[in-house]
A protein has these predicted regions:
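Active-site beta->alpha loop and helix N-cap motifs at the rims of alpha/beta catalytic domains
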Residues: 2-31, 35-39, 43-123, 152, ...
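Catalytic alpha/beta core domains of metabolic enzymes, predominantly
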Residues: 111, 118, 125-186
Length: 186
């Protein structure tokens, strides 16, 4: 209950909303979850798809998009190279108006993806920036996002909590750093 009160305080202080997105790779489960009014969108990634036995990323994604037309659906690039991420992002974005392209805040070598975030955002590609662990990463992301382009900022509060850090103050700081970006959601 304390966490819920803290979230309400955060929302009241910042004017921003915290949204819940269901993460998965099973169409039947997604369709059941879609009926829950608290779910504001869906997200998946290549790892979840692989674990679910999905071999055709494009076919699965397009089936998902055919079934979920009224909520955001985040589809993740699977490349680690920044140029290839950019190429894949443009393809994913072309699959539907409700697609948010998931870009990790950095690649596996620790190279920030800010330049691609900036380019895609300026081109109007809706983005879901993922694997964020710190408020300073949020600041870096926000400096690269166009205020005109919708975005989802995916801070991994659960993983922050797993390190023994209370995620509520971190989330509050992240929301604060998102001010001035009315089309960005946490």
């Amino acid at each position: 209950m304390k966490l819920m009160n803290s979230n309400k305080e955060i929302i009241m202080e910042t004017g921003l909303k915290v949204s819940i997105y269901a993460d998965g790779a099973d169409i039947d489960t997604i369709l059941k979850i879609k009926k829950n009014r608290y779910i504001k969108g869906f997200t998946t990634n290549p790892t979840l798809m692989r674990k679910a036995g999905i071999n055709d990323y494009e076919s699965f994604s397009k089936e998902l998009l055919n079934n979920v037309t009224d909520l955001p659906v985040s589809l993740e690039v699977f490349a680690d190279d920044l140029d290839e991420m950019l190429r894949q992002a443009k393809i994913l974005a072309s699959w539907g108006e409700n697609v948010y392209v998931k870009i990790p805040v950095m690649n596996t070598l620790g190279v920030p993806t800010g330049p691609i975030i900036k380019k895609l955002s300026e081109e109007g590609v809706a983005l879901n920036i993922t694997a964020i662990m710190t408020s300073s990463q949020v600041s870096e992301v926000m400096s690269n996002l166009s205020i005109k382009t919708p975005s989802i900022i995916s801070v991994f509060a659960g993983r922050i909590a797993d390190t023994g850090i209370d995620p509520v103050p971190v989330m509050k700081e992240c929301l604060f750093r998102m001010k001035g970006h009315p089309k960005s959601k946490l």
